[in-house]
Amino acid sequence: MAPVAYRANSRWSLAWLSPDGQKLLLTRVLRTFAYGYLAVVLALYLEQLGLDGFQIGLVLTGALAGSALMNIFWSIEADHFGRRRTVAIMAVLMALGGLAFALTDNFWTLLLGALTGTISVSNSEVGPFLTVEQAVLPQTAADERRTWLFSLYDMLGSFGGAAGALFAGIVGVFASLGLHGADMYRPLFVLYAAIGVLNLVVFMRLSDRVEMARVEGKRKFLGIHRSKATVAKLSVLFGMDAFAGGLVVQSLVAYWFHLRWGLSPEVLAVIFFAANVVAGLSFLGVGPLATRIGLLNTMVATHLPSNVLLMLVPLAPAAWLAVALYLLRLSTSQMDVPTRKSYSMAVVDADERTATAGITNTARTIASAFSPVLSGFAFGVAALGVPFFVAGGVKIAYDGLIYATFRKVRPPEEELRVQSRLTRQAAARP
């Protein structure tokens, strides 16, 4: 489907965005609200159920592995099965996963619930929802708005996550009402299931325009034809970054603050509310910066300093300083997310977008699936700072490699700007 018409003077009214695009923004906010509070309480809940650090890491790894398996399947089948039906099925699985966590104390049942691929271990998502929505969004606005749309998508997601993180403090209210131990967390998982149902309702109201137009000809391997080399390189590099990120997902960072400094769920709720607000506000600068220096340069320039700050967090001698360094890191660390999505959608053909989103997100999820169990092991042997040091170092290496690999590969709109500038310069010569 062609993108909707671009309206230059209606940025904040969302008149430039199709109704389907607006619905996807709504589902994003609903999910990230749930992810936001789950990121704060998930590891604490599992600890209350009697799981040790290694078992907690296994459940989180199971969640990421389930997301990867779903991504592998749906990145191949979503365009043929139907994008709307795909996300509807995932919404049902989200509801079932939430109920599984709410109703059981059994480790193996929890692991099975995690394998639905819809239990998030951070306020962000890399599963099938993201794969389909990332492919659909460029169809809901003009190319000139693509990067801003992804920035808005991620900004609203961060604000949803912030609200969810703050909402996690409600466990204190549940405790005052007589719920104790694991029971004071269970209502949040019931709410998680309800949010899955709300997503289902919205997804069923999407129009046929979200579907990929049928393309004549032989079906290509994994949905990729012209861009195989590009997608392969992106997948390897994104996987490298995600492995490092998986060592310090928000669930584990919240657990680290709890272990290292003894912070309560109520305090953690405020910290991660602030963290998500800071990350959300940072997205406002992505569009102007990317327009000025380019998508790839924006990815690297904002990501690199945040990784240095990440390595400083465990070195802080006081809790307040560790929190301050973590928040300062988030002021730039997420700015590469919308630029990464926009860039990967721009450098492939339109009929490759779902497959590209699925393959790169699957690579990220598989790579990150190995990380939480390693962090859980490190926490179990009191090596609390190691995940931060390893994550920061690997991410710095990723920044250098992605710049070296793709510095000469420009999205179409950047090529047009370069050509326009060269034309003006040529016309100005005597």
Model-derived segments and spans:
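Helix-loop boundary and gating motifs at the non-cytosolic
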Residues: 14-65, 230-238, 242-272
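Hydrophobic core of transmembrane alpha-helices in multi-pass small-molecule transporters
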Residues: 29, 97, 107-128, 321-335
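Helix-to-loop junctions at the C-terminal end of transmembrane segments
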Residues: 70-82, 172, 282-295, 379
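Juxtamembrane intracellular "pre-TM" segments in multi-pass secondary transporters
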Residues: 2-18, 208-242, 259, 421-422, ...
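C-terminal membrane-cytosol helix-exit motif in multi-pass small-molecule transporters
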Residues: 168, 172, 193-213, 398-406
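Transmembrane alpha-helix termini and helix-breaking/packing motifs in multi-pass membrane transporters
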Residues: 43-44, 48, 162-183, 259-260, ...
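Central cavity-lining transmembrane alpha-helices of secondary-active solute carriers
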Residues: 58-76, 273-285
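Structural signature of the two symmetry-related core transmembrane helices
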Residues: 85-100, 297-312
